[in-house]
Swiss-Prot record:
Annotated source species: Schizosaccharomyces pombe (strain 972 / ATCC 24843) (Fission yeast)
UniProt domain SH3: residue ranges: 1106-1165
GO biological process terms on file: actin cortical patch assembly; actin cortical patch localization; actin filament organization; dynein-driven meiotic oscillatory nuclear movement; endocytosis; mitotic cytokinesis
Disulfide cysteine pairs (residue numbers): none
Post-translational modification: Phosphorylation of the TEDS site (Ser-361) is required for the polarization of the actin cytoskeleton. Phosphorylation probably activates the myosin-I ATPase activity.
Subcellular location, principal: cytoplasm
Region (Actin-binding): 409-491
InterPro entries: Fungal_myosin-I_SH3, Kinesin_motor_dom_sf, Myo1_CA, Myosin_head_motor_dom-like, Myosin_TH1, MYSc_Myo1, P-loop_NTPase, SH3-like_dom_sf
Pro residues composition-biased segments: 1093-1103
Function field: Type-I myosin implicated in the organization of the actin cytoskeleton. Required for proper actin cytoskeleton polarization. At the cell cortex, assembles in patch-like structures together with proteins from the actin-polymerizing machinery and promotes actin assembly. Functions as actin nucleation-promoting factor (NPF) for the Arp2/3 complex. Contributes to proper septation by transporting vesicles containing septal material to the division site and is involved in the formation of sterol-rich membrane domains at the cell division site. Required also for mating.
Lineage summary: Eukaryota, Fungi, Dikarya, Ascomycota, Taphrinomycotina
Domain notes: The myosin motor domain displays actin-stimulated ATPase activity and generates a mechanochemical force.
In-chain residues carrying the UniProt-annotated modification Phosphoserine: S361, S742, S782, S1211
Domain TH1, residue spans: 778-964
Record protein name field: Myosin-1
Length: 1217
């Protein structure tokens, strides 16, 4: 079955089969599927490299212990019961599988449901999902999850549609209560088989459903194994019955009834009977079971419970009598019949003889206590069985559809699994027979599908041997030769009245089956070799269970009841003179199984094979032997081999091409599917470009087949790596984009905020200019364009600051203006002199703060405090002076007269707080120095004072300022059309490192790594480097001795410096440039001037002896640029310059280079003395060596000097171009 591509689920599912030519419908985009998470092991067992039962078991265990309970075999799902909630059934996970194919998602029961729903909707084919496995393996849970998924994805708007979906979901709790019970293997074991067929219209919307019931284990009503329980509904009803039922039906606790307490297990861990009873009642309400119908249902349950409490004792005539007559009296009330009729039906059996077609005599045969108990139990089982059938029919009635647009259906089969007990009887034979039929369908349909696909695709394959269990099915159901069911029917017909005789006759007829290799007969037992293992069945009582008929007197008792509901649920008794043999239980089972097989054969099947990991129901235990046995009898190995018979993987051309197109440059570009030819040729091109041998694949008519799973692994791995690379590129581009966007946004915000602040500052400044416009001469600095009114120049608004505490401000006091100022201090007999003060203005008060020494400590005190609301006016002169008079109408200490350099800002701020303040400008200023005493201050022009004023003898002397009509210049703006950096102009080069004595111009140094305590790798050293210091040359006595010109030559930089990290500029002395060194010319005859009589200068004094700063290399360091030195561990080098950045300039063999400071340590050995000259260094270092060694050292040093001089000249030549 091909993996389908979900292109458009909304389209009508009328698409034809895949085009054999594989012609593409235009360019399509390759989609990166990221929904599939990484898994452990292999999620498809067909991809196992080694196919054995042990390898299958190992892979399932590995996934089980990692919480991966689902695994594929192709399209077959293997489910291992986790016995815990893994959180894998949430609504988000459910939605993640909607519209996805198997390759796009991890194995899950939702994927099986999605595939079945899509196939049904797209191709109008009936689907069925067959869930098989042993009891406790999780079949019922899987069926519930499938119903949950399908009802969700098919949900549509409409009252009727929503009602149908709700009823379908409500059938689960209802049928679980009446059809499930606690067993030793499973706390919620299905004791019946159920086939739910969901019916959909052409739009894929559910319009109805039908439930078919199989094999209800009615024997559980009267008999349970120790530590098992009866059906859940009995415990729910007896624990949580409403009071009206307790009063009407006499309901008591479960411990008071034999049918519920004999097993000695009234409660189960993890099951709340009270809560489940409410769920059952809600389900009945949703389905539409009326309250009178509910009353009758619980009446039948009450009858069964009270029947179980009837006990018999032996009578005088050898018959039996009822021990407690009160129970039968209450049962007569519940059933609606006389008490005597109940006692007669339970203790007496009516037998009738027959002579051919004539009716014979009628006899009343008394029953002993054992026989009476059997009749009681038969009645109880019959009531419950008929009640269960009625509930199923009632649900079907609620789900019946009136929609004429019925299209297709999806069937979900949940039937209890293969059973092997210590004592196996007729019930286990029927259950195992049905499982054999399902196994037969699985094998035939799986093999048939594979065969048809290979034939259709013209692919040759080798058939795989497998066990065909048809022989086992024939052993049970065959008529000729007679099988087990036929032998039982013959035995019943021979000895109808006597069960023991019938069992004996059945045992004799089994001798005819002894030649069957799958059958063995033993004393009073027989063995059937099923596909799941050998099962030993007991013959005792098997024929009686096969008859499954109520006695005539019991049926007569039921139909004599005045309860119409009870009579309606029981079938009408057949006429006693009918010669036709009534069908036995085996006949009904065989008919139901064949009908089920016929229904399933008309559908496209999907399979879920459930596995139980342990018998303890523990979430942590994995019984390898137990699972291995299930793997074997489920035939998983054969299924894998059938799936891999020819090829482990097959896919349609278009899907394969679109999935793996990225692996070929001819079929895709940048992740886009660009192939213009047909899909088949695209697949061939992809396989060719990925170097897949032709022996590893074959091309069918519409699909590509890959032989080994390793080939698929290789393709998937290459595809993952491609998308990983693409994802990395996208992430890198996205991060770069986000960073640029963030930086741009930050720049815009910064500029906008600055512009916004500047606009506000400019507006306030212009307001002040307007306030004094045409009234007062202006100072030159007052109208500068860069002048801004910041206000709090003394940071008085800082909480707990000096001025804050001095003025006693609180959090609610906002400082608007603070400034240093001067006030006139009046002294007796002398002119007043300005004295410094601090001015603080808030929205409420104006403070004048004085600083003075108190007790030899410098302290601050509030000298004056004015309420802003009490200020009447402000006085100024009409000249450019800075004196201001603040007149306080309610002041007791006089006004303030002070000099404030930012007077315009101060007055503007004051005016904005109190609009009633008058600004008085004139040639004089009047203020009250003391209360009631007016002082007049005059002004006088003095051109000797240009930019300042002074006070003397009541007169302010000031020079002529700018005209009163002067306006403030506009704020400076950034250059239009240029960037911020361009507007600021070129950034000056920052010299980070000290200049050397005679620097040598080198190419711009690369960034260096920060020094580390331990050696780091090369990759680590390339990150976060600070700029390295420029290379500097050591003094060279040879060059220094040569005459130099006095002309300074500009040296061009040899390399281009990065804009983001400018290299430190170096200034090269003319003396260090070889091009500027004067070379002595050769002597020329007759043209050489005579030497001067002046004697030559004396030779220079010997250089001072300096001590070498030697260091020992701790680690190896490999230089990666020309200005870095390569050093080896334990090598001794000389450090000539240390930089705080962590890079030191080292000297070794006459060559210099930078090394990390953390890679070297101070050398503690003997330090030889040397001169500054490199030549003398070499000589003194080798003064104790042999002549040969001295010559070698001298030669090496000379070579090093020549190389260094050549390097210097080369560098200078590069800078001259």
């Amino acid at each position: 079955m091909a993996i389908l591509k979900r292109t458009n689920r909304a389209k009508a599912a009328t698409a034809a089969a895949p085009n054999s030519t594989g012609k593409s419908n235009g360019i399509k985009k390759a989609v990166y599927t990221s929904t599939r998470k990484k898994t452990v092991g292999v999620d498809d067992l067909t991809l196992l490299s080694k196919i054995t039962d042990e390898e299958i078991n190992k892979n399932l265990e590995l996934r089980f212990r990692n919480g991966e309970i689902y695994t594929y075999i192709g399209h077959v799902l293997i489910s291992v019961n986790p016995f815990r909630d893994l959180g894998i059934y949430t609504m988000d996970i459910l939605k993640s599988y909607q519209g996805k194919n198997r390759l796009e998602t991890s194995p899950h029961v939702y994927a099986i449901a999605e595939n079945a729903y899509y196939q049904m909707k797209s191709y109008h084919e009936n689907q069925c999902i067959i869930i098989s496995g042993e009891s406790g393996a999780g079949k019922t849970e899987a069926a519930k999850r499938i119903m949950q998924y399908i009802t969700h994805v098919s949900k549509s708007v409409g009252t009727e549609i929503e009602r149908v979906s709700e009823i379908i979901l409500a059938t689960n709790p209802l049928l679980e209560s009446f059809g499930c019970a606690k067993t030793l293997r499973n706390n919620n074991s299905s004791r019946h088989g159920k086939y739910l067929e969901m019916i959909f219209n052409s739009g894929g919307v559910p319009v109805g459903a039908k439930i078919t019931n199989y094999l209800l284990e009615k024997n559980r009503i009267v008999n349970q194994v120790r530590n098992e329980r009866n059906f859940h509904i009995f415990y729910q009803f007896t624990k949580s019955a409403p009071q009206k039922y307790r009063d009407t039906y006499g309901i008591q606790g479960p411990e008071n009834y034999v049918y519920t307490s004999a097993c000695q297990c009234l409660s189960v861990d993890g099951i709340s009977d009270e809560k489940d009873f409410q769920g059952t009642m809600n389900a009945m309400k949703v389905i539409g079971i009326t309250e009178p119908e509910q009353d009758e249902i619980f009446r039948m349950l009450s009858i069964i419970l009270w029947l179980g409490n009837i006990q018999f004792q032996e009578g005088q005539d050898g018959g039996s009598v009822i021990s407690d007559k009160s129970i039968t009296e209450f049962l007569g009330y519940l059933i609606g019949v006389p008490v005597a009729a109940i006692e007669r039906a339970l203790t007496i059996r009516i037998m009738q003889t027959q002579h051919g077609a004539r009716r014979g005599s009628v006899y009343e045969v008394p029953l002993n206590p054992t026989q009476a108990l059997a009749v009681r139990d038969a009645l109880s089982m019959a009531i419950y069985n008929c009640l269960f059938d009625w509930i199923v029919e009632r649900v079907n009635k609620a789900l019946v559809t009136s929609d004429n647009s019925v299209s297709n259906s999806i069937g979900i089969l949940d039937i209890y699994g293969f059973e092997i007990f210590e004592n196996n009887s007729f019930e286990q034979l029927c259950i195992n027979y049905v499982n054999e039929k399902l196994q037969q369908i699985f094998i035939e349909l799986t093999l048939k599908t594979e065969q048809e696909e290979y034939v259709r695709e013209q692919i040759a394959w080798t058939p795989i041997k497998y066990f065909n269990n048809k022989v086992v099915c024939d052993l049970i159901e065959s008529k000729r030769p007679p099988g087990l069911f036929a032998a039982m029917n013959d035995a019943i017909a021979t000895a109808h009245a006597d069960s023991a005789a019938a069992d004996s006759a059945f045992a004799q007829r089994l001798n005819f089956l002894s030649s069957n290799p799958h059958f063995e007969q033993r004393q009073n037992q027989f063995i059937v070799k099923h596909y799941a293992g050998d099962v030993t069945y007991s013959i005792t009582g098997m024929t009686d269970k096969n008859k499954d008929q109520l006695a005539t007197d019991i049926l007569n008792l039921i139909h004599s009841s005045n309860n119409e509901f009870m009579k309606s649920i029981f079938p009408v008794a057949e006429e006693s003179n009918s010669r036709r043999r009534p069908p036995t239980a085996g006949d009904r089972i065989k008919t139901s199984a064949n009908d089920l097989v016929e229904t399933l054969m008309k559908c496209q099947p999907s399979y879920i094979r459930t596995i139980k990991p342990n018998q303890t129901k523990s979430p942590n235990d994995y019984d390898q032997q137990m699972v291995l046995h299930q793997i074997k009898y489920l035939g998983l190995q054969e299924n894998i081999r059938i799936r891999r018979a020819g090829f482990a993987y097959r896919q349609a051309f278009d899907t394969f091409a679109q999935r793996f197109a990225v692996l070929s440059g001819k079929t895709s570009y940048a992740g886009e599917y660009t192939w213009q030819g047909d899909d088949k040729s695209a697949c061939e091109q992809i396989l060719k470009d990925t170097n897949i041998p032709s022996s590893e694949y074959q091309m069918g008519t519409s699909k590509v087949f890959i032989k080994n799973p390793e080939t698929l692994f290789a393709l998937e791995d290459m595809r993952d790596k491609f998308w990983d690379t693409m994802a990395t590129r996208i992430q890198r581009a996205w991060r770069s984009y986000v960073r640029r966007r963030s930086e741009a946004a930050a720049c815009i915000q910064k500029l906008w905020n600055r512009n916004k602040v500047n606009m506000e500052l400019e507006r306030v400044r212009n307001e002040g200019t307007k306030l004094l416009q045409g009234k007062k001469q202006r100072r030159r600095y007052s109208i500068l364009g860069s002048r801004k009114f910041y206000g709090d120049y003394l940071s008085a608004s800082k909480p707990n600051g000096t001025l804050w505490n001095t003025c006693g401000l609180s959090q609610n006091d906002h400082v608007i203006f603070s400034m240093r100022c001067e006030v006139l201090v009046h002294k007796l007999g002398r002119t007043s002199k300005p004295s410094p003060r601090q001015l603080v203005l808030t929205k409420k008060n104006l403070y004048l703060v004085i600083t003075k020494i108190v007790d030899q400590k410098l302290t601050q005190q509030v000298e004056k405090k004015f309420a802003v609301s009490s200020i009447d006016s402000v006085g100024l002169t009409n000249l450019q002076d800075d004196w201001v008079a603040i007149r306080n109408k309610s002041s007791q200490n006089g006004d303030m007269f002070l000099r404030c350099f930012f007077k315009t800002e101060f007055i503007t701020t004051l005016k904005r707080i109190n609009r009633n303040i008058q600004v008085i400008v004139g040639p004089t200023i009047q203020y009250c120095r003391k209360p009631g005493k007016v002082q007049t201050v005059k002004t006088a022009k003095d051109e000797t004072t240009k930019d300042y004023d002074y006070y003397k003898s009541g007169t302010i002397h000031v020079g002529t300022g700018l005209p009163p009509t002067s306006k403030s210049k506009p704020f400076p703006r950034l250059a239009t059309g240029g960037s911020t950096a361009a507007a600021r102009g070129p950034r000056p080069v920052v010299q980070n490192k000290p200049a050397a004595t005679k620097p040598v111009s080198m190419p711009a140094a690369k960034s260096k790594p920060a020094p580390m305590a331990n050696p780091v790798s090369t990759a680590q050293q390339t990150q976060n480097r600070p700029p390295a210091p420029a290379m500097q040359a050591r003094p060279n006595t040879t060059q220094a001795a040569a005459p130099v010109t006095s002309t300074t030559t500009t040296i061009k930089q040899a390399t281009t410096v990065s804009a983001s990290k400018p290299a430190p500029s170096t200034v090269t002395s003319a003396a260090s440039s070889p091009s500027n060194i004067s070379k002595p010319s050769a002597p020329v005859a007759n043209n050489v001037s005579k030497p001067s009589a002046v004697p030559p200068p004396p030779p220079p004094p010997p250089a001072e002896v300096e001590k070498k700063d030697l260091y020992l290399a701790l680690y190896d360091f490999a230089g990666r640029s020309p200005n870095e030195m390569t050093i080896k561990k334990d090598e001794i080098i000389e450090i000539v310059q240390k930089e705080p950045s962590g890079w030191w300039l080292a000297l070794k063999n006459g060559a210099e280079g930078w090394v990390p400071a953390t890679y070297v340590t101070e050398y503690k050995g003997s330090t030889p003395q040397t001169t500054a000259s490199s030549t003398n260094v070499a000589a003194q270092a080798n003064n104790n060596a042999s002549p040969a060694e001295v010559n070698n050292l001298a030669g090496s040093l000379a070579d090093a000097l020549r190389m260094r001089a050549s390097a210097v000249r080369g560098s200078d030549e590069e800078e001259d171009w």
